[in-house]
Each structure stands twice: as structure tokens, then as C-alpha cells.
């Protein structure tokens, strides 16, 4: 992506109004591709194989497509717009995040705007060759204890996009070599510490 046709934050208002009027309140968003350095692309996102590592091999392969996102991907070495959805109108682009900041409740509704003062959610296609590492996302209450927001998440694998299972559907939960059964029992006993 080049910056030539990207509208700066302070110039979004005028083009946003025109885009919303032309789309009867709907905005056209461009694809948002996100690589993961620790996973391998499953090749079902309909990207050309030459584009799977568009950000470079060190960044990892593109295995996620995000929709309606105002959230930057939490990837090391990311490009400035990674994870952000762009609105496309008359050959120009601006971030959905800037659009939401500009239009507020007019764009996302009063209830969401008043509660979050931003667009707090997004959807994604998730496409890996094999299982993702075992991990967890904290709920809102637990995340707040460490100054973060919760991340409620669920997965749906539509058959239309999953006609090939690749190396799925399982995950691994591993322990360091040498971990004994008693080590695990001791850790579980200290769960609430």
C-alpha cells in the first residue's frame, strides 16, 4: 500500500460525508491482511501464492483477513496500518478508525459510541495450515486487573471456506522437557495464588 491516495486524519470529514451519502450510509472497506510470524498460511483466503508473504518471510505468512477493524495488529515490526480497515471511495482511502472518530454515533450508533467512544470489535477469517498454539484470552474482569481489555472470542469454520482441512483440528499444550507430574500438580494447587 502506498500513501499517495491515503487521506490524512484531519481531511477525512469531507470525503466521509460524500462516501456515506453515496453508499446510503454504507462504506466500502478494502481487504485487511494480517500475517503471523509463528503460523503458516492455510492458503484458503483466496490470495495468490505470491502474496502469502507480502510483508516478508521474517514477518510470517498472511493467514488472517480482518473485517471492520479499527484495531492495530499486535505484531512485532508491523507496518503502520496493519490490522486497520480502510474505506475506499473515489480512488482514495482513509481508515475506518478515522471515520469512526470523525462521525461517532452517526456511523456506529449511539449505544456503542456512548459506551466505548470507538468501534470496539472486528471479525476475521482465520486460515492456518496447522493448529494454533494453545492460548487463552482473558475476560473483561480478569484483563482489567492488569490494565487491559478482555477479548471475548469464538471461532466458526464455515464449510464454504474450509473445503480442505489442512492439518487441523487440534492444538497442542506443551510442557518444558523434564516437567514432572508433581510439577503440574503443584502448579494447579497454586492456581489462585
Model features per residue range: what roles?
Residues 181-193:
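Active-site glycine-rich loop that binds ribose-phosphate moieties when present
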Residues 1-181:
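Transition-metal
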Amino acid at each position: 500500500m502506498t500513501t499517495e491516495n491515503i487521506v490524512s486524519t484531519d481531511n477525512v470529514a469531507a470525503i466521509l460525508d460524500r462516501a456515506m451519502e453515496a453508499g446510503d450510509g454504507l462504506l466500502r472497506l478494502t481487504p485487511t491482511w494480517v500475517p503471523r510470524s509463528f503460523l503458516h498460511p492455510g492458503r484458503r483466503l483466496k490470495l495468490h501464492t505470491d502474496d502469502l508473504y507480502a510483508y516478508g518471510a521474517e514477518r510470517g505468512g498472511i493467514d488472517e483477513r480482518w473485517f471492520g477493524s479499527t484495531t492495530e495488529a499486535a505484531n512485532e515490526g508491523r507496518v503502520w496500518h496493519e490490522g486497520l480497515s480502510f474505506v475506499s471511495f473515489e480512488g482514495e482511502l482513509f481508515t475506518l478508525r478515522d471515520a469512526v472518530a470523525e462521525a461517532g454515533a452517526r456511523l456506529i450508533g449511539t449505544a456503542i459510541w456512548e459506551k466505548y467512544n470507538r468501534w470496539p470489535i472486528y471479525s476475521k477469517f482465520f486460515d492456518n495450515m496447522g493448529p494454533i498454539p494453545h492460548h487463552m484470552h482473558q475476560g473483561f474482569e480478569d484483563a482489567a486487573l492488569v490494565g487491559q481489555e478482555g477479548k471475548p472470542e469464538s471461532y466458526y469454520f464455515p464449510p464454504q471456506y474450509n473445503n480442505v482441512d489442512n492439518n487441523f483440528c487440534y492444538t497442542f499444550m506443551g510442557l518444558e522437557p523434564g516437567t514432572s507430574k508433581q510439577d503440574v500438580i503443584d502448579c494447579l494447587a497454586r492456581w489462585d495464588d
